[in-house]
Amino acid sequence: MLITIPDLLTPEEVAYMRQILEGTAWVDGRSTAGDQAGKVKRNLQVPVDSPEARELGNIVLRALGRSPVYSSAALPAHILPPMFNRYDEGMTFGAHVDGSIRVVPGTGQRIRTDVSTTVFLTPPEDYDGGELVMHDTYGQHSVKLPAGHAVVYPATSLHSVTPVTRGSRWASFFWAQSMVRDDWRRHMLYDLDMSIMRIRSMLPDDDPAVTGITAHYHNMIRHWAET
């Protein structure tokens, strides 16, 4: 399940974040990659323990908190602190799967990575290449979104970032442990929740059709969720 969230960040938030990132230090992105991913990863990242990463990460987390689409798609139990990367000319990230377990910086707490998210911080017209590509049994799916838009996808996905051939592509990325670890179940729950929203736009909340399907949704959550 691949879901895009338009305008997760406001234009003002994007502008502020880019201003801060312009003046921050960047390090080799391979410092946070595993052995296999490190062999195909060529990008730069903001150190996860830097003041800039913490400040900007909190902006992203607040944006997630006001996004019902993210909540419905990810059903997050825990969200790892958002990170920030950049791909300059010639930089790329070959096909890989994200590590299944990550440690929350400074705590030692281990989080299962069920859901991945990328938030684009650079307008697509400012760079060539840099598409996020999902590889699955149905082929390849490229994602290149406006600044402030986000894409949410299963962390189990084989994916890559194509080489940047002009400009620089900046983004925030992070993972969540979902209350529902199985992607197919999350997909069904998301589709059902979107149907509920559409029905509620046409019928009053006390209509039996609305209360019935809403009860069904919450009972499925109750059956599948881990907290």
Swiss-Prot record:
The keyword Metal-binding applies. GO terms for biological process: DNA damage response; intracellular iron ion homeostasis. Fe cation binds at H96, D98, H159. Its EC number is 1.14.11.-. InterPro entries: Oxoglu/Fe-dep_dioxygenase_dom, PKHD_C, PKHD_hydroxylase, Pro_4_hyd_alph, Pro_4_hyd_alph_FE2OG_OXY. Keywords: Dioxygenase, Iron, Metal-binding, Oxidoreductase, Plasmid, Vitamin C. HAMAP family: Hydroxyl_YbiX. NCBIfam families: PRK05467.1-3, PRK05467.1-4. This is PKHD-type hydroxylase Pden_4677.
